[in-house]
A protein has these predicted regions:
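Nucleotidyltransferase catalytic core that binds NTPs
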Residues: 1-97
Length: 97
């Protein structure tokens, strides 16, 4: 089974890294998808965020990464992925999703 882990990753945190670590063990393939968000003012530009994600992704043979614009579901569909992975720090995050 394949999964997509989308986010702006601005910045990539230890929490994100832990989710990638766990997901790499659960799924055959994991796509870490770095969102280009025109509505968010980011601390790091897209290229810097991709570099950080690449460093983590390279630790796992079944983890790849990409950037995308638009809807997460469209990115998942384009990559033939049916499972979207999300992290939730607390009930507020869970309710938001």
């Amino acid at each position: 089974m394949n999964a997509i882990y989308p986010g702006t990753f601005d910045p990539l945190t230890l929490g994100h890294e832990e989710i990638i670590n766990r997901a790499a063990k659960l799924f055959d393939n994991l796509l870490v998808a770095v969102a280009v968000s025109s509505s968010k003012l980011t601390m790091f530009d897209l290229q810097d965020r991709l570099k950080l994600v690449e460093i983590i992704s390279n630790r796992y043979p079944n983890v790849t990464f990409t950037s995308y614009k638009g809807l997460t579901v469209d990115c998942a569909h384009t990559n033939n992925i049916k499972t979207i992975l999300r992290g939730a720090r607390n009930s507020t995050d869970f309710n938001y999703e």
